[in-house]
């Protein structure tokens, strides 16, 4: 039914998946929260999430942000989107672990300061400055070396999108 809120636009999932993610065709354009925009570098889009690198060289730190304006909590996504989110978390976390050869992955959805749903995927090493504590507030953000961060992003893109 064209023109009604029940009209849907279909987005294909990751290759090999038969399910689809639907979003109302009259949904407003998605936008990234201004704080996340300021603090990150865009890597690219998966079917549901934008993948970003946090601008802090202290830790290999990624964000996944579902492209749903209304989502503040994971429970704000429908069941198909929640399943897709888990698929994308796994794919990105696996890539991060392979690229960094980290000891541990920290995965969290906090959102106390930024109300847009986003998930942190952080590679941790027992030798990092915050180990074993959480990374928040331990050290001031350290700017990335431009060449190093581009190499990191290229390696992540190969692992995430090419496997």
Language-model-detected regions and their locations in the chain:
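A cross-taxon signal for low-complexity, glycine/charged-rich
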Residues: 1-3, 7, 16-18
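HIT superfamily nucleotide-processing domains
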Residues: 21-163
